[in-house]
Amino acid sequence: MVDAASATRAIGIPIATLSAGSTPTARFHDGASGLTEIRPGTYVFYDALQVALGTAGADHCALSIATTVVSRPTPDRAVVDAGSKTLGLDRGAHSSNLLTDFGTLLGVEGSLSRLSEEHGILHIPADSPLAIGDRIQVVPNHVCSASNLARRFYGLRDGVVEEVITIDAAGGVH
């Protein structure tokens, strides 16, 4: 990108903005490359895909989906009220299928292995204490679709809501 911009400038065409990047490459931007801006899309939140790529650690993921257990049909299965409309169906960038589940469960042993539009199916140990009404957190595989539809973000610190942030651009893709 920088070489192409240099060649373009060399033939007399001015370039004021040189913009490139992605979340996995953001850490390599040192400010001296010639880029005037970078565009790391999920950098502000990170997600399960960035953890799988090694871009971030799980403790760097700043957004999770709060979902409620709505059914416990068998000892080794639970149903939550977050499905593909909330979590998305991504399992990796550009069909890479890096991830086998549809999100990362926080503080719960098990996997989120299937989604319908409105529900997620958890496979859990038969002796799991999860019960109907329990709230759990799921880090989405790809945070973009999850955050695009949200009307509010709840800022938590140590499990306590510290701030409610209204999202003015919720669903604003046209």
Predicted regions and their residues:
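C-terminal accessory subdomain/extension
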Residues: 74-174
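Short coil-to-beta-strand transition motifs
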Residues: 59-66
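Active-site loop/helix belt of alpha/beta enzymes
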Residues: 1-57
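Sparse, context-dependent recognition of short Cys/His-centered cofactor- or disulfide-binding micro-motifs
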Residues: 3, 23, 50-54, 63, ...
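A residue-level signal for beta-strand positions that form part of recognition/binding surfaces
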Residues: 35-37, 66, 77, 119
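Non-transmembrane, interaction-prone segments in cytosolic or luminal domains
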Residues: 29, 38-40, 50-51, 60, ...
